[in-house]
């Protein structure tokens, strides 16, 4: 590889790592379920004709990149700002930089860098790194999948302790499920029940098992 190709490889890798900002938000909001990052990505691509067009253009540029070294840099910049509508910055609540989110992000970084190292050492130039950039959502899903059992085992003591405390007290427990407005529904219901009962509400938007247990 010449210096231009190596520089391109490094820039692509940095761009792919930067994409973690977007995937972190989705991962946390969807309770770190493997596969949901890709699901949301394709949902946004299908939802707008502009996103479908941009995806088509980037795929064409990937072919062009076989002949022009700087094209992958353009692709990595495009992928930072797309899909349109699924922005890097949260429109509602901010991403909570928890230890779990940091761990899965570090795992993502490791996978991205590993792909780039393989791309270099196996003689593929920057092409494997470019593929990782195009499918960074899939790589983040793999990081979630790799960390899933570890996180499950790590959270089990907290969940078991919380379950014992609840079971040792003869009090009614209300759980609210759904895709949207769980926190709003929880707060409204708590306000109603508080008129004639002592009510304890889980703080803020901690709606997953570990968040509630802690």
Identify the role of each PLM range.
Residues 1-3:
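Short, strongly hydrophobic alpha-helical membrane anchors
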Residues 5-214:
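Phosphate-binding loop of NTP-binding sites
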């Amino acid at each position: 590889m010449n210096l231009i190709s190596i520089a391109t490889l490094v820039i692509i890798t940095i761009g792919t790592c930067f994409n973690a900002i977007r995937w972190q938000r989705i991962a946390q909001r969807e309770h770190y379920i493997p596969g949901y990052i890709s699901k949301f990505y394709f949902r946004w691509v299908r939802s707008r004709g502009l996103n479908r067009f941009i995806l088509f253009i980037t795929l064409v540029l990937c072919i062009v990149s076989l002949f022009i070294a700087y094209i992958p840099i353009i692709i990595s910049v495009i992928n930072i700002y797309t899909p349109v509508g699924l922005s890097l910055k949260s429109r509602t609540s901010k991403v909570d930089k928890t230890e779990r989110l940091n761990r899965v992000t570090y795992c993502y970084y490791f996978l991205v860098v590993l792909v780039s190292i393989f791309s270099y050492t196996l003689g593929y130039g920057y092409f494997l790194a470019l593929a990782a950039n195009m499918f960074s959502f899939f790589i983040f899903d793999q990081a979630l999948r790799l960390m899933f059992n570890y996180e499950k085992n790590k959270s089990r003591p907290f969940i078991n302790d919380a379950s014992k405390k609840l079971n040792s007290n003869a009090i009614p427990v209300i759980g609210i499920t759904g895709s949207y407005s769980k926190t709003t529904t929880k707060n409204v219901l708590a306000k109603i029940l508080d008129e004639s009962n002592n009510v304890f509400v889980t703080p803020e938007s901690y709606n997953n098992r570990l968040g509630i247990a802690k």
